[in-house]
Amino acid sequence: MKSSSLENGTLANAGVYEDDLDSDEELVSEEEFENFNNEDSEDDEDSNNESKTAKSQLAEIPFDTLLNAQRDLLKEQQKTKIDRKNMKHTEKVDKKFLAKERNTPLKNCQVKNQFLVFAKFDSLSGNLSKDKVKKNYGFLNEYRVSEIQQLRDELKICKDQERAESIRQTLKSLLSKMERHLEEERAERVMHEFRAQEKERVKEGKKPFYLKRNEQKKLIQMDKYKSMEGTKALDKYIEKKRRRRAQKEKKHLPRARPSANSQNK
């Protein structure tokens, strides 16, 4: 029986032969084999029942709720992806920031306030030509003169003391600017005339002569005196100069020591 079952049954197909089996060993009985098959069939039936119940439950759920659930899942997945990307990005940024902090020289030094400069008057835009500036912005002097006249007329009529004081201050600043502008024009004119004369002398064969700063100031002062000759402005100017010199001399004079009586008082 054994040999026929081994040759014709499943054991022969599985590669089990008579020599490999001992006489004392017994094969699985038919009852046990049927029990195994019954257990497998029961497991399959349970899994089928579970899948059927799940399908029936899904069929009972409305379609809108399923769509909303699917959208929520997709949103959560996208959020997780974005969070991971942000984490990587922040790590990179932090590393770059640390590298910049380490490599910045003079980190704790106090920098002076940077003043904004109009690009037209910046040194990077080229050399300044004063002649072109005068031609292009000459109307500002005319506007300043008219403004001074308007303020003077307003000061005559004004009765408010605070307003009158503010007008006087603005007039003072405008007049000082006008005087400074006239002095600069005078200095440029005088030096231009002197250079033209020196060029003519060099052409005649003479050596060039260069004025020092003190000599330039004296030359400009002489031209100013010549323009004021025969007027009261010259006397006023000389008187003002005399007062300034007197005040400077007073500062340098030695002071008298206080007496003992004044100290006791």
Swiss-Prot record:
Protein name: rRNA biogenesis protein rrp36
Localization per Swiss-Prot or TrEMBL: Nucleus, Nucleolus
Compositionally skewed regions (Polar residues) per UniProt: 1-11
Provenance organism: Schizosaccharomyces pombe (strain 972 / ATCC 24843)
Transmembrane feature ranges: none
Major subcellular location class: nucleus
Keyword Membrane: no
Known function: Component of the 90S pre-ribosome involved in the maturation of rRNAs. Required for early cleavages of the pre-RNAs in the 40S ribosomal subunit maturation pathway.
Family that this chain belongs to: Belongs to the RRP36 family.
Xref: InterPro entries: RRP36 (IPR009292)
Region ranges (Disordered): 1-59, 231-265
